[in-house]
From Swiss-Prot:
<protein>
    <recommendedName>
        <fullName>Tubulin gamma-1 chain</fullName>
    </recommendedName>
</protein>
<comment type="subunit">
    <text>Component of the gamma-tubulin ring complex (gTuRC) consisting of TUBGCP2, TUBGCP3, TUBGCP4, TUBGCP5 and TUBGCP6 and gamma-tubulin TUBG1 or TUBG2. TUBGCP2, TUBGCP3, TUBGCP4, TUBGCP5 and TUBGCP6 assemble in a 5:5:2:1:1 stoichiometry; each is associated with a gamma-tubulin, thereby arranging 14 gamma-tubulins in a helical manner. Gamma-tubulin at the first position is blocked by TUBGCP3 at the last position, allowing 13 protafilaments to grow into a microtubule.</text>
</comment>
<dbReference type="InterPro" id="IPR037103">
    <property type="entry name" value="Tubulin/FtsZ-like_C"/>
</dbReference>
<dbReference type="GO" id="GO:0000212">
    <property type="term" value="P:meiotic spindle organization"/>
</dbReference>
<dbReference type="InterPro" id="IPR003008">
    <property type="entry name" value="Tubulin_FtsZ_GTPase"/>
</dbReference>
<dbReference type="GO" id="GO:0005737">
    <property type="term" value="C:cytoplasm"/>
</dbReference>
<dbReference type="GO" id="GO:0000070">
    <property type="term" value="P:mitotic sister chromatid segregation"/>
</dbReference>
<dbReference type="GO" id="GO:0007020">
    <property type="term" value="P:microtubule nucleation"/>
</dbReference>
<dbReference type="Pfam" id="PF00091">
    <property type="entry name" value="Tubulin"/>
</dbReference>
<keyword id="KW-0963">Cytoplasm</keyword>
<keyword id="KW-0547">Nucleotide-binding</keyword>
<dbReference type="GO" id="GO:0005813">
    <property type="term" value="C:centrosome"/>
</dbReference>
<keyword id="KW-0206">Cytoskeleton</keyword>
<feature type="binding site">
    <location>
        <begin position="142"/>
        <end position="148"/>
    </location>
    <ligand>
        <name>GTP</name>
    </ligand>
</feature>
<dbReference type="InterPro" id="IPR017975">
    <property type="entry name" value="Tubulin_CS"/>
</dbReference>
<dbReference type="GO" id="GO:0007052">
    <property type="term" value="P:mitotic spindle organization"/>
</dbReference>
<dbReference type="InterPro" id="IPR018316">
    <property type="entry name" value="Tubulin/FtsZ_2-layer-sand-dom"/>
</dbReference>
Amino acid sequence: MPREIITLQLGQCGNQIGFEFWKQLCAEHGISPEGIVEEFATEGTDRKDVFFYQADDEHYIPRAVLLDLEPRVIHSILNSPYAKLYNPENIYLSEHGGGAGNNWASGFSQGEKIHEDIFDIIDREADGSDSLEGFVLCHSIAGGTGSGLGSYLLERLNDRYPKKLVQTYSVFPNQDEMSDVVVQPYNSLLTLKRLTQNADCVVVLDNTALNRIATDRLHIQNPSFSQINQLVSTIMSASTTTLRYPGYMNNDLIGLIASLIPTPRLHFLMTGYTPLTTDQSVASVRKTTVLDVMRRLLQPKNVMVSTGRDRQTNHCYIAILNIIQGEVDPTQVHKSLQRIRERKLANFIPWGPASIQVALSRKSPYLPSAHRVSGLMMANHTSISSLFERTCRQYDKLRKREAFLEQFRKEDIFKENFDELDTSREIVQQLIDEYHAATRPDYISWGTQEQ
């Protein structure tokens, strides 16, 4: 019984990474850009219907909703070879097409105006599923549409579908270069409040780290957006392989999430992937064994979140799930886990078991791969809080000077006062505090003393 997942793509970033994700899924399942199953795709052991459904003429259509407040990216998708893949009724562009101007408040208040049209699309998709498991939201947190409209939709999804899971792939801004969005810290903080309160699981895609990996590991001098987005689509497709090539465990979203998130608020995950290769570097193929892959996944340089060195806090893993793709002998997995535990390659929380789970998954039979084994690590690690601390520091600088707030004042939510900003700041601070508390043995009783 497949549990379907509806993908919501928001704004420029969300639609670009979503586009790469669907390209990747089509390649893995042997589906042509028009949605027709290729003649060579005869192995019927994959589950296409988690992410696709079939039209009357047998071609596959993604369960995706494409939303944007300005037309550029969606038009480029509609002019690509994949234009016929999507259901045109599932594409929503706002009528005036002016975008949200990288302003969270603008994206949020436009969400209030257009949410009925958007939910007509989402409800229709949900009604077309046999047993909908949840939603996956792709967006960035720094701009206007992905952050503002994304925040609004997260709140509404919780009201409308309280029992469905909401997982997000959230792109965090690149800290190494100057941003062209001056209000980025405001946008990020306001979105983080919703990600904390309204999502069940947030996969953090940190542009700072993705750029670093592209330059250091893939040796690309100035990585373009499309190269970074390919990295992202690799993560997204690898994190859903167990849903699409079902094994005996982790073959639905709740199974993936349950093993990684023991306490509800600490649901921000980081990812690592190995071995990374681009088309040019196939020459550097090594022999990959399960132990190699699992050991490399624990190396900080393969982790796609740039967390600073925090000497005061003893950061540790809350839980790890490694999704290993390829030809793997299960006894090897057991040995590798023992080796990792013996050598203490990973530092775990003091208040619970050292949870490293391994899900084995097949590779797509239709994609040539240079490696026998590749792996994706999804980890819940307390050092993710340093990302939120960085956002808070930047926010505090701007807020102290009340910089750029007049852009927000124009919208209803900030007409009277800026309480929404201040409560968001408090909620993100509580999240940071809880991550710090999770590094200590007394975390189990944390939050009970204060009341």
